[in-house]
Swiss-Prot record:
It is found in: Cell membrane; Cell surface. It comes from Homo sapiens. Residues 47-261 are extracellular. Residues 1-22 are cytoplasmic. Disulfide bonds join 178-218. One of its GO terms (cellular component) is cell surface. GO terms for biological process: B cell differentiation; B cell proliferation; CD40 signaling pathway; cell surface receptor signaling pathway; inflammatory response; integrin-mediated signaling pathway; isotype switching; leukocyte cell-cell adhesion. This is CD40 ligand. Its main location: membrane. The chain crosses the membrane at residues 23-46. Residues 122-261 form the THD domain. Homotrimer. Interacts with isoform 3 of CD28. CD40 ligand, soluble form: Exists as either a monomer or a homotrimer. Forms a ternary complex between CD40 and integrins for CD40-CD40LG signaling. It is linked to Immunodeficiency with hyper-IgM, type 1: Immunoglobulin isotype switch defect characterized by elevated concentrations of serum IgM and decreased amounts of all other isotypes. Affected males present at an early age (usually within the first year of life) recurrent bacterial and opportunistic infections, including Pneumocystis carinii pneumonia and intractable diarrhea due to cryptosporidium infection. Despite substitution treatment with intravenous immunoglobulin, the overall prognosis is rather poor, with a death rate of about 10% before adolescence.
């Protein structure tokens, strides 16, 4: 009987770093990270400190310069005449530059103010107002959402806008009327934008017409007029209609205005 003997192979030793080595690597990593953070913080502190030192040095130089000027004025013998003359010359140059810059700034501000005064914004927007008069010229009032920018444009006699400055103006008008009221004739309803210049006859700038309607209840129709015209100082513009009794004076229906371009 043959007995076989199998010898078991020895177990392989566990691979990997020892615990002491792992601890050392961990501490080294923490140290490096801490050192980088500390270096960054120190760099920021050093930069701010250098800026502060630079400011203090500049202030100190300014103080020394002003102190030297004071000593030159008091006539202290510790300074030579040549140094005093040179320092005074530098100081006078600085003061001269400051005064010139100040004068230039004042001139620029004054020019801007004069420019604004020379080209003020001129605008007007007025609302229609019912009138018992039978005149064909529509009446207007400064009410509701009206605009009257300044005294360079005025509403005179409640019927015409008068400008006091020459220039190009955009003039507009909207007239809303009831088209099915009994009219004296079958002629269309006509709205005209008219100009009255000093020493000249009245003339029509724009005109629009709309036909009557038999629709009931009252059929509202609107006429729009608008254009750009050259106006002289003292010129007046107004709106003329064929039948003012048909004009609707409700909110936003009929309005009139101008704007200087």
């Amino acid at each position: 009987m043959i007995e076989t003997y199998n010898q078991t192979s020895p177990r392989s030793a566990a691979t990997g770093l020892p615990i002491s080595m792992k601890i050392f690597m961990y501490l080294l990593t923490v140290f490096l990270i801490t050192q980088m953070i500390g270096s960054a913080l120190f760099a920021v502190y050093l930069h701010r400190r250098l800026d502060k030192i630079e400011d203090e040095r500049n202030l100190h130089e300014d103080f020394v310069f002003m102190k030297t000027i004071q000593r030159c004025n008091t006539g202290e013998r510790s300074l030579s005449l040549l140094n005093c003359e040179e320092i005074k010359s530098q100081f006078e140059g600085f003061v001269k530059d400051i005064m010139l810059n100040k004068e230039e700034t004042k001139k620029e501000n004054s020019f801007e103010m004069q420019k604004g005064d020379q080209n003020p914004q001129i605008a007007a927007h007025v609302i229609s107002e019912a009138s018992s008069k039978t005149t064909s010229v529509l009446q207007w009032a400064e009410k509701g959402y009206y605009t009257m920018s300044n005294n360079l444009v005025t509403l005179e006699n409640g019927k015409q806008l008068t400008v006091k400055r020459q220039g190009l103006y955009y003039i507009y008008a909207q007239v809303t009327f009831c088209s099915n009221r009994e009219a004296s004739s079958q002629a269309p309803f006509i709205a005209s934008l008219c100009l009255k210049s000093p020493g000249r006859f009245e003339r029509i700038l724009l005109r629009a017409a709309n036909t009557h309607s038999s629709a009931k209840p009252c059929g509202q129709q609107s006429i729009h007029l608008g254009g750009v015209f050259e106006l002289q100082p003292g010129a007046s513009v107004f709106v003329n209609v064929t039948d003012p009794s048909q004009v609707s004076h409700g909110t936003g229906f009929t309005s009139f205005g101008l704007l200087k371009l």
